Amino acid sequence: MPSAIEAIYIILIAGELTIGIWGNGFIVLVNCIDWLKRRDISLIDIILISLAISRICLLCVISLDGFFMLLFPGTYGNSVLVSIVNVVWTFANNSSLWFTSCLSIFYLLKIANISHPFFFWLKLKINKVMLAILLGSFLISLIISVPKNDDMWYHLFKVSHEENITWKFKVSKIPGTFKQLTLNLGVMVPFILCLISFFLLLFSLVRHTKQIRLHATGFRDPSTEAHMRAIKAVIIFLLLLIVYYPVFLVMTSSALIPQGKLVLMIGDIVTVIFPSSHSFILIMGNSKLREAFLKMLRFVKCFLRRRKPFVP
């Protein structure tokens, strides 16, 4: 019988999981239906589909990890199961963040106006460049998540005297924990790429605004609006990642922290917010997805009105 804290955890994580999978599944479904209708798919749709699928995987593995830890602690201790969860978690986490950085780079290349030959060449070859970056992101995430030989990590943290049983358990967790922490430091690279994209977009906006004022053609033109939307999208991602990443690192090292189970439960709840909430931000920021979402809401509203029981 789960305790009150565990019951609250199950309710919250189940709610977040439902919202997150629904939101990301909606992105995949709408873009795939549009792809089948038009027999063609745009670059932004490929990026959004890749990002949504990776986040569905991430949400599922985070939730399964929490449920196994809570409901089947004996099974959770199985080294094979833990290894599988770690591999899938590392791959889904890294691919999600790398694909988000791809989205930031796409905004930069599509919207920004920077007078540099290399940047101009990237804009001309945007489809090939972005597909190459997407493929590279997938391969990097796959390579990082491949299980490695743990001998090196165990030699780094070898302890000769382990008299206390609790400490012995914690020491046995150090190599795997340190390995996971080291591997997850790789997500700083997509974060830095998003940061660079943000500053370049900001630079392009400032430069564009000066040109508009110089020629006195108005301020709120389509290019300025596009800059503002892209900057807002990147800022929201950066803010969510600033919250997500430290919590994720704490979760990874939960075996070394007192009350590690409670830390892991709180961490699960916080980390699931990132892939769940960001999906709806992407929906509202994309005209096609936003239109489909509003149509669906109108349909649900009409359906509920028809199902409303008649009261004489």
Curated annotation (Swiss-Prot):
InterPro entries: GPCR_Rhodpsn_7TM, TAS2R. The keyword Membrane applies. It comes from the Eukaryota. SUPFAM superfamilies: Family A G protein-coupled receptor-like. One of its GO terms (biological process) is detection of chemical stimulus involved in sensory perception of bitter taste. Gene3D superfamilies: Rhodopsin 7-helix transmembrane proteins. Residues 1-9, 73-86, 147-180, 258-261 are extracellular. Residues 33-52, 110-128, 204-234, 285-312 are cytoplasmic. Keywords: G-protein coupled receptor, Glycoprotein, Membrane, Receptor, Sensory transduction, Taste, Transducer, Transmembrane, Transmembrane helix. It is a multi-pass membrane protein. PANTHER family: TASTE RECEPTOR TYPE 2, TASTE RECEPTOR TYPE 2 MEMBER 9. Several bitter taste receptors are expressed in a single taste receptor cell. Belongs to the G-protein coupled receptor T2R family. Gustducin-coupled receptor implicated in the perception of bitter compounds in the oral cavity and the gastrointestinal tract. Signals through PLCB2 and the calcium-regulated cation channel TRPM5. This is Taste receptor type 2 member 9.
